Amino acid sequence: MTTIPQSDFKPLEERLGYKFKDKGMLVQALTHRSYLNEHSDFPYEHNERLEFLGDAVLELIVTEYLYKNYANPEGELTNWRAALVNAKTLAGIATQLAFEDYLLMSKGEAKDKESKARMYILANAIEAIIGSIYLDGGAGAAESFIHKHILSILPFILKNQLYIDPKSKFQETAQELLGITPNYKVLKESGPDHNKEFTVGVFLDKELVAVGSGTSKQEAQIAAAQAGLDAKHWSVSMS
């Protein structure tokens, strides 16, 4: 049976700002489904049920905070909330908390550090940790964690308009600075119909600024726009 000494979690708990009464809740929050495929005798479930709970807790607490503290229209608050709870933001917070080395994954998943899948694994683990804190310490403990690690970055998001999606931001900036409206072209399609991969270029007039890929044209356009923001230094990093 695979076991983890409870004392090993002390540095992580200090970074999280929460000490678990039941360390098993923390272990489960850090356990990816793939780990159980290689460790059938592992005594804990994977983290997907905790993720399900944590997602709901996170959305409620963020929504309540925005409602109570800002009189902006519903549409704006929705965009702000999305910027706070999306996978990229949560994965960035997970990286800052340095708990990637604590994640329990299959050997294959553990090696694949730079993939989009890893970003979602990290984001889902944050939600699972929120769920585990909620069960272990109650709503107040979960709210404290969310305020400390997630809502604390709201001023940065608002200042840098990170709630605007990359396509909109790239277009607005290009029009403001250059007087040009970007256009997108599919440069490549690959893969079978059920698993297509699109490569899209974003152009300013005839200049190819950047490319992006995704499983849909829309996803590839968003990736290209983000790459364009980075290439033009019109983007601000969360790190």
Where in the sequence are the language-model features?
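Double-stranded RNA-binding/processing signature
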Residues: 1-239
